[in-house]
């Protein structure tokens, strides 16, 4: 049974984990334009090539349903495991709180919740339980963080808004010294909430003209917008670990 353009576009978009707004931003159209195609109000589009490139699908398939969804090269790249060759394998060593740090390791605080993280790298002492995670100095150096671990905080992500990339409970590491917004990167942010406390979350950010930010959740169809001046950047997420 032949599918419609609306069905094919939605299939490809959801497979990439993109919202209608995020996809629209990628190709220079509005969220409403993407929605119009997906609900069947537009049976064709002049943006087939741009859509195909960003969704990693064949333009013939997207436009007319002809042939496979993806090229053989893309299919292979999606199927191939991201495991490096054995020559590049590292080693895993068991350690606990009594194990001495190696010369290439530092410890950083592991908080119980993002709510206790401060934008200047401080932590609220009444919550901090003393738990720490270890990072190699090489890892911190690679991402541009301080190699002594200062300014780096870890905590578990909460909620399902960033699934499937960052499921509930995922441990994330944030460099609070890195607040420069790069489109598409993940950040810990704080905004004014309904009460006296600020709402702190992990989100994907995009800058827009007029001092606006698009605040994207992987598991939401509609993005938020806020003035950059109203959003406190706690720091950039540079690492996360998911329990499978």
Curated annotation (Swiss-Prot):
Residue ranges of the annotated DNA-binding region, renumbered to this chain: 20-39
InterPro entries referenced in this protein's UniProt entry, alphabetically: Cro/C1-type_HTH, Lambda_DNA-bd_dom_sf, LexA-like, LexA/Signal_pep-like_sf, Peptidase_S24_S26A/B/C
A Gene Ontology molecular function term of the record: DNA binding
Xref: SMART domains: HTH_XRE
Domain of life: Bacteria
Annotated keywords: DNA-binding, Transcription, Transcription regulation
Domain HTH cro/C1-type stretches: 9-62
Record function comment: Regulates pectin lyase production in response to DNA damage.
The protein, known as: HTH-type transcriptional regulator RdgA
Naturally occurring in which organism (per UniProt): Pectobacterium carotovorum subsp. carotovorum
Originating gene: rdgA
């Amino acid at each position: 049974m032949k599918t419609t353009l609306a069905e094919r576009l939605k299939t490809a978009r959801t497979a990439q984990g993109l919202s209608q707004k995020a996809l629209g931003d990628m190709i220079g159209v509005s969220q409403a334009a993407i929605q119009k195609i997906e609900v069947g109000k537009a049976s064709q589009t002049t943006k087939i090539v741009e859509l195909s490139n960003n969704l990693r699908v064949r333009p013939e398939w997207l436009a007319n349903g002809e042939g496979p969804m993806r090229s053989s090269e893309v299919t292979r790249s999606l199927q191939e495991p991201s495991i490096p060759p054995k020559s590049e394998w590292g080693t895993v060593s068991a350690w606990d709180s009594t194990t001495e740090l190696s010369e290439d390791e530092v410890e950083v605080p592991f908080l119980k919740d993002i709510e206790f993280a401060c934008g200047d790298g401080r932590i609220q002492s009444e919550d901090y339980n003393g738990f720490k995670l270890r990072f190699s100095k090489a890892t911190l150096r690679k991402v541009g963080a301080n190699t002594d671990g200062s300014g780096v905080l870890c905590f578990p992500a909460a909620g399902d808004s960033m699934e499937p990339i960052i499921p509930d409970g995922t441990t994330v590491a944030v460099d609070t010294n890195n607040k420069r917004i790069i489109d598409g990167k993940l950040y810990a942010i704080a905004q004014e909430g309904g009460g006296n406390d600020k709402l702190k979350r992990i989100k994907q950010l995009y800058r827009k003209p007029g001092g606006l930010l698009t605040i994207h959740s992987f598991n939401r169809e509609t993005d938020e917008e806020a003035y950059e001046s109203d959003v406190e950047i706690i720091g950039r997420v540079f690492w996360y670990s998911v329990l499978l």
